[in-house]
């Protein structure tokens, strides 16, 4: 069963579009957009299991230059 998550990302000021472009290139990320509101980017990612999803977030998203913080919400339905 595939695990899907919405990831809310905060970036350094003025970096949202650049960071979103980099995040789109991460394997497992199906979408990443710069948005308005309390967070700078919303991304959707999928992985075969929770462990792999965690690795994707930590190694693939949080390691992108300009990412300050992320909040991951796993889809429940």
Protein language model regions, located:
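A compositional/biophysical signature of low hydrophobicity enriched in polar/charged and small residues
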Residues: 1-77
């Amino acid at each position: 069963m595939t695990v899907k998550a919405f990831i809310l990302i905060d970036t350094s000021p003025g970096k949202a579009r650049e960071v979103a472009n980099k995040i789109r290139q991460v394997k497992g990320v199906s979408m990443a957009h710069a948005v308005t509101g309390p967070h700078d980017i919303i991304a959707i990612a999928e992985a075969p299991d929770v462990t792999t999803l965690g690795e994707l977030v930590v190694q693939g998203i949080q390691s992108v230059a300009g990412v300050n913080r992320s909040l991951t919400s796993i889809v429940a339905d």
